[in-house]
Regions:
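Surface-exposed, interaction-prone regions used to assemble/regulate multi-protein complexes
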Residues: 1-10
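Domain-level detector of nuclease and nuclease-like folds
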Residues: 9-147
């Protein structure tokens, strides 16, 4: 657990007005912090389009028959498409393993989306990729939310 499983938003940051903000890419072209106050008004009403035009740092596209889904690496949204409808935004797409994307991030995003749909409340949401040195891929992702 990070911070005893307590959200790290200050009182000044908390709001019920929907917004989304994506930091500029760093000097190596890597994603930085992504933050949003997510309400139903930000959630997509149409299906996701292709994101294949975005090549995040560290991107490798090789399929393997022995890997579930075929690919070791996925293009991963920092803030999932189902939450804000952001599609091929290079400031919101990182290279991550399929496992991290499907088993790590997706269940958390599903839980947040279900909560918003069921309650019509807003959720403060922040994702920070931690990059060490000149590496292309984050070694850690920290996702925080507050209802």
């Amino acid at each position: 657990e990070v911070n005893d499983n307590q959200p790290e938003f200050t009182e000044e940051e908390l709001t019920t007005v929907s917004y989304e903000d994506y930091s500029e890419l760093d000097e190596l072209g890597r994603c930085q912090l992504a933050e949003a106050c997510i309400g139903q008004d930000l959630m997509p009403t149409e299906a996701r389009e292709s994101i294949s035009s975005v090549k995040p740092t560290g991107w490798k596209n090789k399929s393997y028959d022995t890997v579930d889904g075929g690919y070791v690496y996925n293009r991963c949204h920092l803030i999932g498409f189902q939450l804000t409808g952001e599609n091929a935004n290079e400031e919101n797409l990182i290279t991550g393993t399929r496992y991290m994307n499907v088993e790590g991030m997706l269940p958390f995003e599903d839980e947040v989306a279900a909560y918003i749909k069921e309650t019509d409340n807003h959720v403060m949401y922040r994702v920070t990729p931690f990059l060490r040195g000149m590496t292309w891929l984050p070694q850690e992702y920290r996702c925080r939310q507050s209802q």
